[in-house]
């Protein structure tokens, strides 16, 4: 059950963060695919650290 909640939280965070970083505040997740590779290169290290923090909080 925790894994499902964790996955949902991660997907939600990604769907919200990517359009903001891509510079389109009113854009939904669908609009982020234009420069998705560039964006992912920038945020992947931060995202991995954030996911690790979330995982450690969930695990105790």
From Swiss-Prot:
The modification Glutamine amide is found at residue 59. Transmembrane segments: none annotated. Expressed by the venom gland. Residues 24-33 form a propeptide. GO terms for molecular function: toxin activity. Residues 1-23 form the signal peptide. It is found in: Secreted. Keywords: Amidation, Neurotoxin, Secreted, Signal, Toxin. One of its GO terms (cellular component) is extracellular region. The keyword tRNA-binding does not apply. Coiled coil: none annotated. Toxin that causes a rapid and irreversible paralysis when intrathoracically injected into insects (blowflies). Does not cause spontaneous nocifensive behaviors by intraplantar injection in mice. Belongs to the formicidae venom clade 2 family. This is Myrmicitoxin(1)-Pr4c. It comes from Pogonomyrmex rugosus. The lineage of its organism: Eukaryota, Metazoa, Ecdysozoa, Arthropoda, Hexapoda.
